[in-house]
Amino acid sequence: MATFDFSEKLPFGEMFLVKSSEIEGRIDVGFYQHYQPNINSIKLSKLASMQGGKRLPKGRDYTDDETDFLYFRVSDMEEYGNTNFENCKFITAETYKELARYELFEDDLVISIAGTIGKIQRIKSIPQDKKIILTENCAKISIKDVNELNPEYLCLILKTEFVQQQIMASSIQTTIPKLGLDKVLALKIPVIPPLDVQDEIIHRYENALLARNNKLKQAQTLLNSINSYLLGELGITLPETDNSLNSRIFTVQMSEVGGGAFDPFTQFNKHYRIEGGKYPNERLDNIAFLQKGQSITSDDIVSGDYPVIAGGQTSPYSHNVCNHKGNVITVSASGAYSGYVWYHDYPIFASDCTVIFSKDENELITEFLAEVLKVKQQEIYLLQKGAGQPHVYPNDLAKLNIPLPDKPTQQKIIAHIQAIKAQAATLQAEAEQLLSQAKAEIEQMILGGAQ
């Protein structure tokens, strides 16, 4: 047989050999780029069956009423831990009857096959008396013999790089990426070890996940302490919220009504504002600039290094220019998350938001103002106006009262909060590193046992 001499300078993966006996149905190079012939494998179809989900019938929609019937979507899938059904949409009994053959059951595996490709979720702890219907953007995988294959072990296999690379190579890359059921069933799975070996690997993963979650919980506890610390430093005591019927029926003198807000919610919530304390308070517009963001559409975007800050809690895309250099606060202007407070110490392109920054850093440090506004987050959410598309307007933000200690006190508070955030960030990084290392070791155990 002829020999092949590949240049040592050729980057790994740009040229490789595949035996003709190893080619099955496809001859495109990309599909075999990550092929590992040394892994003893079998097709998924030998171990499990599949069924696609189903879209809501024409003329049917979700219901706002709580029912025993839920519709499971890609967005309801969790990367770690048990399935979270709390965000599932409700459907009516009539809709369920039409879709009953697409029901999910305990220990089914779900794989996303449209849009976001390759997410894997084991269905666990279905709420009592609830029926779950699967979206058309997913398919369910049902194990043929649970006495030979633990569902959790198969879930771990499907999340390995070995399988995920096959999934990406098998998908159709169109405007909306798609993955055919036949391609999923054709996935090559490392041979399955005895159940006791499966259980050992699962146990190791669960221990790593538990350790990760404990570190994340410690980090969140630290972050949650920031509000209490800041309020204590400012000498502000939060009033206890009373939502009893008697407290919700009240009278207001006309002299107390001002600013054009005559609705009962504004008058009720004003008693729960975070203001006062041991330092003087100033209206926000007296001590800070409030500027509207610059309108931009997806057609105007030129991919670049600067995150576009719009109406959500994350940046939807990046642009090639910025309109603020950093050290600014954004408050989302519209949408479900209108009022969301976000501090940026880096350049941004501010779009559907209000941009806030200090008029005088010697009097008010912008980063300190950001921490105060985060404490007032719920108060700011209550400024939302409009039903279909809620908005938070700059004129309403301008009226917020801001406690204003002297600059050294602001600096002390900022330093303490930064230390808390740094400690929390370290714990979060350790948590992800711990799990990442465990996943790599587990994948090696799974693949190593199949060689």
Named regions from a protein language model:
Residues P57-D64, E86-N87, A169-S171, T241-L245, ...:
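Short coil/turn segments at secondary-structure boundaries
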Residues E78-F90, L109-S112, T116-L134, E152, ...:
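Short, ligand-facing micro-motifs at secondary-structure edges
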Residues K131-A139, E152, S171-D196, P347-T354, ...:
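A short glycine-rich beta-alpha junction/loop motif
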Residues N147-Y153, D196, E361-E367, Q410-Q411:
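Short, conserved charged micro-motifs
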